[in-house]
Amino acid sequence: MKYLASFRTTLKVSRYLFRALALLIWLLIAFVSVFYIVNALHQRESEIRQEFNLSSDQAQRFIQRTSDVMKELKYIAENRLTAENGVMSSRARDDKMVVPDFEPLFADSDCAAMGSAWRGSLESLAWFMRYWRDNFSAAYDLNRVFLIGSDNLCMANFGLREMPVERDDALKALHERIMKYRNAPQEESGNNLFWISQGARQGVGYFYALTPVYLANRLQALLGVEQSIRMENFFTPGSLPMGVTIIDENGHSLISLTGPDGIIKAEPRWMQERSWFGYTPGFRELVLKKSLPPSSLSIVYSVPVDLVLERIRILILNAILLNVLVGAGLFTLARMYERRIFIPAESDAQRLEEHEQFNRKIVASAPVGICILRTIDGVNILSNELAHTYLNMLTHEDRQRLTQIICGQQVNFVDVLTSNNTNLQISFVHSRYRNENVAICVLVDVSTRVKMEESLQEMAQAAEQASQSKSMFLATVSHELRTPLYGIIGNLDLLQTKELPKGVDRLVTAMNNSSSLLLKIISDILDFSKIESEQLKIEPREFSPREVMNHITANYLPLVVRKQLGLYCFIEPDVPVSLNGDPMRLQQVISNLLSNAIKFTDIGCIVLHVRCDGDYLSIRVRDTGVGIPAKEVVRLFDPFFQVGTGVQRNFQGTGLGLAICEKLISMMDGDISVDSEPGMGSQFTLRIPLYGAQYPVKKSVEGLAGTCCWLAVRNTSLCQFIETSLARSGVHTQRYEGQEPAADDILIVDDALEHTWQGRAAVVFCRRHIGIPLERAPGEWVHSVASVHELPALLARIYSIELDSEALSSALPTTDKTADSNDDMMILVVDDHPINRRLLADQLGSLGYQCKTANDGVDALNVLSKNAIDIVLSDVNMPNMDGYRLTQRIRQLGLTLPVVGVTANALAEEKQRCLESGMDSCLSKPVTLDALKQTLAVYAERVRKTRA
């Protein structure tokens, strides 16, 4: 269970880890996007810085060029000034020498003294400046050069160009710089001074440079230059719309050509660095600040951040959109993966855990021992308490044997007898459990079952002995009862063939009925016993159901007429002409039902209806008898059950007839049902399958087509059957209500004729008529209601039409031989019982056969050796040599004459044994004259054919 719980926890942790993985992937993509954007930004910044540097290089070159000019001018000035009193050496000069203009810088400045003292030097310097202006100043773009005396602080102005001078602003700026210079520390007094003055237009001004002039290590003057400065010259062509500002060492803006966002305010952190590149506070502008040596000035370039981001703005939007889409996709994927993978897996794990708990509870509560053994060593991994107890009962040898069997996988169970004599049956199947090969074993205590099996075996042996005893009892009862009964019934049959005095025939008939009833009771008991012991077998063969029904109705019709009842037999035209089944057992069932119907019916009629019902042959027996209560119908087929005490008093029987019928029909794969109403009668319907059925060809009888029959039949069922039967033969039928008939018309009635019929003939269906149709008066025929299906044959006879044998329904074949026609047959009767031997001889004599007798098999062989015998009629149970060995000996002698066995044992095994010994047939005692007559007629005909 811990394994499953950890697995479920692992799934839950995996789900959260998958979420974290999706988040990390999104963050990674976002980081890559940011990195890419930052890289693009840095690249853009690098491009802008490169442009800033190119522009600043121009400014630097401007400053450096001015510084170089100052050095040259300083050199010129030092060469033109004499070393004595600041007077320049005398040189040949032009007569038109111009003295420069003097401007006092301070209120106490003495420009007259400077002009008188430095007149020659200034004239020489002015001449040189004019020469230099004419030849070189255009290249340096200088406006003017001025010289300031260190003592009198008066400025000599050497104008190089005609430029307007903002006098006040220039003097003020010059005054401030000179004061700054004079107040500077000693170590800074030799440095040049640079400053810029803003002009009238933005971005245009004047650049000033001031350098000291020393003679003999003494400061004599300050030499300065003024140069026009245009900030637009500090941009590279095609550069960004940037702003540029020049600031002094204190961060004050001197001149600027600003961009869109105005003047840049210097930051303190800029001033600490010679070169600084970055963003202003608030990230409004990107700035490059660079110093302009040798001056103390710095130039600042700036562009708005919007211009920096202009090229990467689309990239930023794409990156944001990409990250949003990726985030949404990852979220959707993670959610979908959770729903389709993790959540179902957790549910499965939950169900698996529940199943594991459920299985453990089942195993724990199972009434058998269940355990899981590892196959490699037989170690118990999991088991319930009962299995643990059983395993402790096993000896060491049993455990080793069990382990070997599990490893071998040859069998799936083993029986073990434990040390305390407990029988265990261990069955197992191989499987895997927690990544190991295991065997799931079920241990069952079969001690009770073993004892029960031993008890059942003893009971089976006892039942076998009882069955053998029962069979022996049945054989004994059959033999001992049938043998004397054969003497009674056989002699009564012979007695009825004689002419008896008046009154004696009634007594003989009563004795014959009683003996027949006794024989039926004995036969029912024996049949039921044979069915219960499964000794009664169905013997299927091809037979005609029409012949069976004709035979049954012919046998029972006299009894029905005697009780003044009516027996209607309807055989539908679609009934097969032949099918496979056991005709004797079918005849037994129908005879039993018909016998019961006759027995329980005092008034009315009995209807026997045969038709096809799908794949079954349906036979219905309906009577108008006393009926059966509904509560007793359910027990009707129980053995020895009889309906009601009143019925039991009035009617004799054992209560086995219907039980035997139900068993026999079931053995023939059929079924039987009953429908009854007290006071209205009963209806029994049995069905048997149509195995191998052959149906009649549907065709009309030639000569009957177009004929007309008038029906005056009161019985509705009879009338409907006649109409159907005649319509199949092509006969036209009409209801007769006094119409005038034609000369060839036939009238069919089921009552006596009231008037003479004027047509061809009249057919009267009579319930009391027995036998074939008879013409009792000219044109008046009487027909039995038990053979309504033979009406077309009678009509053909009336119309003088010849019918095919297929169009007629014939009864069972009978051999109509006279007594004197069998005197050519010599029959040997073999029986150890003198009464039976004498009775058989008398019966054969009454049938016209010649007869010889023998006491046993040995005597029979002696008779056979001395006489010409045609047929042997032998009992099977005799002393010295029984009928079986007699038959075998006859066959060994090469004799092929028919041998018919006579046995009092009615069991099927007895008849089968007779046939296996070589007999041709077997008759059961008591043997009636009819059975003997039919059997011997067949073999007598065979012998006659052999002689021919």
From Swiss-Prot:
Domain Histidine kinase span(s) in chain numbering: 476-692
Record's keyword annotation contains Lyase: no
Residues in Response regulatory domain copies: 826-940
Residue ranges of the TM segments: 21-41, 314-334
Record bears the keyword Cell cycle: no
CDD domains: HATPase_EvgS-ArcB-TorS-like, HisKA, REC_hyHK_CKI1_RcsC-like
Coiled-coil region list: none
Intracellular or extracellular location(s): Cell inner membrane
Ranges per topology, Periplasmic: 42-313
Membrane topology: Multi-pass membrane protein
Residues bearing PTM Phosphohistidine: 479
Domain PAS: 357-425
One Pfam match: HATPase_c
InterPro entries linked: CheY-like_superfamily, HATPase_C_sf, His_kinase_dom, HisK_dim/P_dom, HisK_dim/P_sf, RcsC, RcsC_C_sf, Sig_transdc_His_kin-like_C
Signal peptide as annotated in the record: none
Domain ABL as annotated: residue spans: 705-805
Modified residues (4-aspartylphosphate): 875
GO biological process: regulation of DNA-templated transcription
The protein's Enzyme Commission number: 2.7.13.3
GO molecular function terms listed in the Swiss-Prot or TrEMBL record: ATP binding; phosphorelay sensor kinase activity
Family, as annotated: Belongs to the RcsC family.
Name of the protein in question: Sensor histidine kinase RcsC
Species name: Salmonella typhi
